């Protein structure tokens, strides 16, 4: 196909098309120190290769790799609205590492994907700094990632995130809920806030109620409370499993679907979990959301974590010792329920 000279533009560059290679290079330079702090001895090489290399430790005898991927959901919309980008990186890490943790896996490494229409180096650096902090909290290496600048794909000032975590567990130590029996106890570990789920409803309630986001809310601004990053439970629970091998029968990361839809994921069909809603106090953020949005109580437990970010199932005779160990590690622990035999037609998790 020929092009007439009169129609030929002056020499075009990638920058003319909306992609700034120099900005990408500047971002890599900014984030290298953050990533370096997360490195583990098993990491071979550094950032910048076509693939990231990780040598599985010889401490594993019969390792099983466990992988997870997730995003941050519409909590990002609030981050854009509030111009607050320093916490969503931790959210991204937490969603994946907490998921693989529940099967007994130690998170080993993490990769991120950051996509935008126009790369803002400061914003992206804030996000990746949060990702690196989350990796430090989880003890895993930020081993690589991808920054995709795609003109016209995203509105100005917006971006999307995806995270990928890989961990390992000894085959004999996989936690799958198969050992849970009637009489077992459900312990609840406190959440830090709404974590990264239910934010479509959070945003709708904020839109309707129009709160002052900078007003005092129990000693903090409302914006800081609603953007509080997801708690990462990895180190306390791995320490528990090492100190008391075999005591954890099942764990449920309370994410999308809330308590009522996540606890059943670790229960056999013939079991049900009876959760006592009076065993912990609904945190102020959830009280406000329920009141401001006139949200039905059961809907609250189906959408939000309602103050419980991780459920841990153990035998009744070790429940106090497990709770004490987790409390000593800095967790707030509640005895929130028990496991019973399931009756015909009964839900697998009942919050009452």
Curated annotation (Swiss-Prot):
Entry's EC annotation: 6.3.3.1
Molecular function terms from GO: ATP binding; phosphoribosylamine-glycine ligase activity; phosphoribosylformylglycinamidine cyclo-ligase activity
CDD domains assigned to the protein according to its UniProt record, in alphabetical order: PurM
Keyword field contains Nucleotide-binding: yes
Pathway as given in its UniProt record: Purine metabolism; IMP biosynthesis via de novo pathway; 5-amino-1-(5-phospho-D-ribosyl)imidazole from N(2)-formyl-N(1)-(5-phospho-D-ribosyl)glycinamide: step 2/2
Gene Ontology CC: cytosol
Keyword Nucleotide-binding: yes
Compartments it resides in: Cytoplasm
UniProt KW keywords: ATP-binding, Cytoplasm, Ligase, Nucleotide-binding, Purine biosynthesis
Family statement: Belongs to the AIR synthase family.
Protein name, entry field: Phosphoribosylformylglycinamidine cyclo-ligase
The species this protein was found in: Azoarcus sp. (strain BH72)
Lineage: Bacteria, Pseudomonadati, Pseudomonadota, Betaproteobacteria, Rhodocyclales
Gene this chain is encoded by: purM
């Amino acid at each position: 196909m020929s092009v007439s000279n009169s129609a030929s533009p002056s020499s075009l560059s990638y920058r003319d098309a909306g992609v700034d290679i120099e900005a990408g290079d500047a971002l890599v330079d900014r984030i290298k120190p953050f990533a370096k702090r997360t490195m583990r001895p098993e990491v071979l090489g550094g950032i910048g290769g076509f693939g990231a290399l990780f040598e599985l430790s010889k401490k594993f005898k019969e390792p099983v790799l466990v992988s997870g991927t997730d995003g941050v959901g519409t909590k990002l919309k609030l981050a854009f609205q509030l111009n607050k980008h320093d916490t969503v990186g931790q959210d991204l890490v937490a969603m994946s590492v907490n998921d693989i943790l529940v099967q007994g896996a130690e998170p080993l490494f993490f990769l991120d994907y950051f996509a935008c229409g126009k790369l803002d180096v400061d914003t992206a650096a804030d996000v990746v700094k949060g990702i690196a902090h989350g990796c430090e909290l989880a003890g895993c290496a930020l081993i690589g990632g991808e920054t995709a600048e795609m003109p016209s794909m995203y509105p100005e000032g917006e971006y999307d995130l995806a995270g990928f975590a890989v961990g390992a567990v000894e085959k004999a130590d996989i936690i799958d809920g198969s050992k849970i029996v009637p009489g077992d106890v459900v312990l609840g570990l406190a959440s830090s806030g709404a974590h990264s789920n239910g934010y479509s409803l959070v945003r709708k309630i904020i839109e309707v109620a129009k709160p002052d986001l900078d007003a005092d809310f129990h000693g903090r601004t409302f914006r800081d409370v609603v953007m509080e990053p997801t708690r990462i439970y990895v180190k306390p629970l791995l320490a528990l499993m090492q100190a008391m091998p075999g005591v954890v029968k099942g764990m449920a990361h309370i994410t999308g679907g809330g308590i009522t839809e996540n606890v059943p994921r670790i229960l056999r069909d013939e079991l049900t979990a009876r959760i006592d809603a009076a065993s912990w106090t609904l945190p102020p953020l959830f009280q406000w959301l329920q009141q401001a949005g006139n949200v039905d109580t059961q809907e609250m437990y189906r959408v939000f974590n309602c103050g419980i970010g991780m459920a841990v199932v153990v035998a009744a005779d070790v429940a106090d010792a497990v709770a004490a160990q987790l409390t000593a590690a800095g967790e707030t622990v509640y005895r929130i329920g028990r496991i019973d035999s399931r009756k015909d037609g009964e839900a697998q998790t009942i919050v009452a």
